[in-house]
A protein has these predicted regions:
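Conserved Radical SAM active-site core
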Residues: 39-75, 79-190, 194-202, 211-223
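C-terminal accessory regions of radical SAM enzymes
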Residues: 278-356
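Conserved C-terminal portion of the radical SAM core fold
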Residues: 212-270, 288-296, 326-330
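Surface-exposed cleft-lining segments at the edges of enzyme active sites
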Residues: 199-207, 233-235
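Short, hinge-like loop/turn segments at secondary-structure boundaries
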Residues: 181-183, 207-208, 247-249, 276-280
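Short, electropositive alpha-helical surface patch
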Residues: 145, 179-193, 240-257, 318-322
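Short glycine/threonine-rich loop-to-helix capping motif typified by GTGT followed
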Residues: 240-246, 273-276, 349-354
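Flexible, acidic/Gly-rich N-terminal and inter-domain linker regions that tether
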Residues: 1-70, 339
């Protein structure tokens, strides 16, 4: 039984509850989010909040991350992916990691200005910067605000490498900039595909582009010479784990050069949000899926241990690893993403970077 049979399921959003913010003194957990008598939900439309940060490039020292530097022009994400690890960051802003994460979006309009300042630091050496480390830089609001596009114009101006991860076809709007970046080996695009099953996609990621649409993004980018990787992430044992080969095959058929994956982990409030969701969306297999996730993370839903937190361990995790490896060997043999060119960077003084 899916959520079609469950009257408690709130359609159009991922989270079914607004969980308690651990940073707030008074606890209030909102469970019946479509109740007509709930005064706190008079407006369920997406709201924008502006932040004016003093810096925009974040640095990570996590040993299991391939990108050490990232920019998040937005916090919160209207896509509503139920599993999103970035949900917990919303609590720092005084919001809930649940429904608030999907409908209260924080925008950083001064991000381009801050990036230009970053590039012009006296001792700056070019590094690949990820768009974005937390939430999708091409989520729906980007269509109107164009903050990501402005950032890409700066990456092109200074000829600094950039890696993008998205699940939205809004990226195709910026083909003009991306094509120029690709011609100089300055861009990689990672397209996230969690499931080819449209019914499952609608439950997991209610406001995202269909898998068919994302495959079309890979194909169109590839046709323009823009290198693409598919991210089959996250893999949720018992929900989409059987789709790993088909996702990689489909992406390879559209031109993807490589693939990656992660196994879901449910840290902080996400464990409560996901548990509530799966009991409403898939009550017939909720307990089994939760136990399978735990088996990949030392008996817990959450996992912060480097090396294991994103790849898991144990029999189920190992079977997923083997499935992924076999699919890559079969469908992506002799393919690889091109290297970035760091020698083209043009700082404020106009002199190109020397790597020697």
């Amino acid at each position: 039984m899916g959520h079609e049979d469950n009257e408690e399921f709130f359609k159009g959003r991922g989270a079914q509850v607004n969980t308690h913010n651990k940073f707030l003194k008074n606890k209030y957990v909102l469970e019946h989010i479509e109740g007509l008598d709930e005064p706190l939900l008079e407006n369920t439309a997406t709201q924008l909040f502006e932040e004016t940060p003093k810096k925009i490039v974040s640095e990570s020292n996590s040993p299991d991350l391939s990108h050490m530097y990232s920019i998040n022009p937005y916090q919160g994400c209207e896509h509503g992916c139920i599993y999103c690890y970035a949900r917990n960051t919303h609590e720092y802003y005084g919001f809930s990691a649940g429904l608030d994460f999907e409908r209260k979006i924080i925008v950083k309009r001064n991000a381009p200005e801050l990036l230009e300042q970053y590039f012009n630091k006296k001792n700056y050496k070019p590094v690949c910067i990820l768009l974005s480390g937390n939430t999708d830089c091409y989520q729906p609001v980007e269509r109107r605000l164009k903050i990501t596009r402005s950032l890409l114009q700066l990456f092109l101006k200074y000829k600094n490498p950039v890696s993008i991860i998205t699940k939205n076809n809004v990226i195709l709007r910026d083909l003009d900039i991306l094509t120029e970046l690709a011609a100089m080996s300055l861009v990689h695009v990672n397209v996230s595909i969690t499931s080819l099953n449209e019914q499952l996609r609608q439950k997991l990621e209610p406001r995202t582009v269909t898998a068919t649409g994302r495959l079309a993004v890979i194909q169109k980018l590839t046709e323009k010479g823009i290198p693409c990787r598919v991210m089959a992430a996250p893999i949720i044992p018992g929900l989409n784990s059987n789709e790993v080969p088909s996702i990689i095959k489909a992406a390879a058929g559209r031109g993807a050069l490589s693939a990656g994956f992660t196994i879901v982990r449910l840290n902080g409030s996400i464990g409560e949000i996901f548990t509530d969701w799966i009991n409403k969306a898939f009550p017939d297999r909720a307990e089994k899926v939760l136990n399978m996730i735990k088996s990949c993370h030392d008996g817990k839903l959450n996992d912060s241990d480097f090396g294991r937190r994103m790849s898991g361990e144990g029999k189920i995790a190992e079977s997923i690893h083997q499935m992924f490896k076999m699919a890559c060997n079969r469908f992506m043999a002799n393919r690889e993403m091109p290297e970035f060119d760091y020698t083209l960077f043009v700082p404020k003084n106009g002199k190109q970077t020397s790597m020697f």
